[in-house]
């Protein structure tokens, strides 16, 4: 055994002793074996505690910084405007009891949807640049044109994303998405926001 390996083993044993001491139990009672400790120490740098937010807080107290950063991202395709359009779509539904675009004259719903989106942005204190306003208007147009429907390929893709998240949680091996994921099927862009 090399000198560094022996030092590493001493370090691992010390960590184990510290853990069981803090837990108020003995190593034998805890049933911790050297291999378990070795694996834990090896992967400890990748541990992450994920504390999600309640979905209700997305609307009432969203993370404005995350939205502003997502809208201003110079590298990745911007998808945050679709989140704002979806929030406005829910408000539209609350007022009209239908989703935008579900009537024959669907284009008449674009401006009211955009108005709901702009009202929401003003209420939460999100300042939109001119380019943000243009992207939001386009997102409201596309959402209205789609009339609250989806294509089979989009549904299949989102089903795959959901299945992947379930696998992450069940296997406890990967960090799951935290809070909001937006998929733009037109430009094939996916963004995740912690709102």
Residue ranges with predicted function:
Residues 1, 36, 149-153:
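Short, charged/polar micro-motifs that form catalytic or ligand-binding hotspots
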Residues 1-7, 11:
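Single conserved hydrophobic/aromatic residue that forms the stacking wall/gate
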Residues 2-3, 79, 147, 170:
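Intrinsic disorder and flexible coil segments
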Residues 9-137:
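Long, low-complexity, polar/charged, intrinsically disordered or flexibly structured peripheral segments
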Residues 101-109, 116-190:
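C-terminal, well-structured subdomains that either form a transmembrane helix-short loop-helix hairpin
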Residues 192-195:
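Conserved catalytic-core surface of thiol
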């Amino acid at each position: 055994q090399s000198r560094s390996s022996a030092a590493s083993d001493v370090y691992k044993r010390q960590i184990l002793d510290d853990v069981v001491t803090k837990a108020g139990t003995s190593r034998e009672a805890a049933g911790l074996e050297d291999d378990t400790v070795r694996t834990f120490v090896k992967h400890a740098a990748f541990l992450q505690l994920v504390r999600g937010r309640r979905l209700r807080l997305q609307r009432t107290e969203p993370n404005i910084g995350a939205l502003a950063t997502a809208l201003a991202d110079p590298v990745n395709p911007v998808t945050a405007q679709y989140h704002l359009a979806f929030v406005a779509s829910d408000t539209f539904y609350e007022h009209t009891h239908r989703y935008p675009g579900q009537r024959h004259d669907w284009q008449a719903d674009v401006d009211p949807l955009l108005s709901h989106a702009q009202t929401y942005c003003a209420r939460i204190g999100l300042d939109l640049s001119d380019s943000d306003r243009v992207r939001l208007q386009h997102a409201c147009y596309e959402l209205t044109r789609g009339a609250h429907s989806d294509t089979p390929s989009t549904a299949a893709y989102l089903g795959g994303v959901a299945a992947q998240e379930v696998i992450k949680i069940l296997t406890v091996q990967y960090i799951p998405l935290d809070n909001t994921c937006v998929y733009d099927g037109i430009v094939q862009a996916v963004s995740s926001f912690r709102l």
